[in-house]
């Protein structure tokens, strides 16, 4: 198993698919990385040489924010919005949808399990 950006990526999958196991790398970035390094898309991880794995590792470290750094950056962005007291920050603070979705019905994922209200029977 190759270890890239602190993640064990599966050895029997294609490189483009295996790179997507890293938080912050999706299909487009995975293809971009393999093109930069010069690895064919159909090559499997267990067929990579140590030099190629090192090239992939260096390309990711140099050009992308992934894993813990990305999670930390997103958390800091949300905290900044909350500290500013802007509308988006208030919505985050109250655990409500941030991007304009309706909340009268729906929004159960963000709000949590429905709380029963006593005396609401007909």
Swiss-Prot record:
Region (Disordered): 95-122
Domain of life: Bacteria
Pfam families attached to this UniProt entry: Ribosomal_S13 (PF00416)
Gene Ontology CC annotations of this record: cytosol; small ribosomal subunit
Record's keyword terms, sorted: Ribonucleoprotein, Ribosomal protein, RNA-binding, rRNA-binding, tRNA-binding
Parts of the chain that traverse the membrane: none
Coiled coil: none
Gene Ontology MF, one: rRNA binding
A biological process term (GO) from this entry: translation
Entry function: Located at the top of the head of the 30S subunit, it contacts several helices of the 16S rRNA. In the 70S ribosome it contacts the 23S rRNA (bridge B1a) and protein L5 of the 50S subunit (bridge B1b), connecting the 2 subunits; these bridges are implicated in subunit movement. Contacts the tRNAs in the A and P-sites.
Family: Belongs to the universal ribosomal protein uS13 family.
HAMAP family the UniProt entry points to: Ribosomal_uS13
Record's subunit section: Part of the 30S ribosomal subunit. Forms a loose heterodimer with protein S19. Forms two bridges to the 50S subunit in the 70S ribosome.
Protein name per UniProt: Small ribosomal subunit protein uS13
UniProt lineage: Bacteria, Pseudomonadati, Pseudomonadota, Alphaproteobacteria, Hyphomicrobiales
């Amino acid at each position: 198993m190759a270890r890239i950006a602190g993640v064990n990526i599966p050895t029997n999958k294609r490189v483009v698919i295996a790179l997507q196991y890293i938080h912050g790398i999706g299909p487009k970035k995975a293809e971009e990385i393999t093109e930069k390094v010069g690895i064919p898309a159909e090559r499997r991880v267990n067929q990579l040489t140590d030099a190629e794995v090192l090239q992939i590792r260096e390309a990711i470290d140099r050009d992308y924010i992934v894993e813990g750094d990305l999670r930390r950056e997103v958390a800091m962005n949300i905290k900044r919005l909350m500290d500013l007291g802007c509308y988006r920050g208030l919505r985050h603070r109250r655990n409500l949808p941030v991007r304009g979705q309706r909340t009268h019905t729906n929004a159960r994922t963000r709000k949590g399990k429905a709380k029963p209200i006593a005396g609401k029977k007909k």
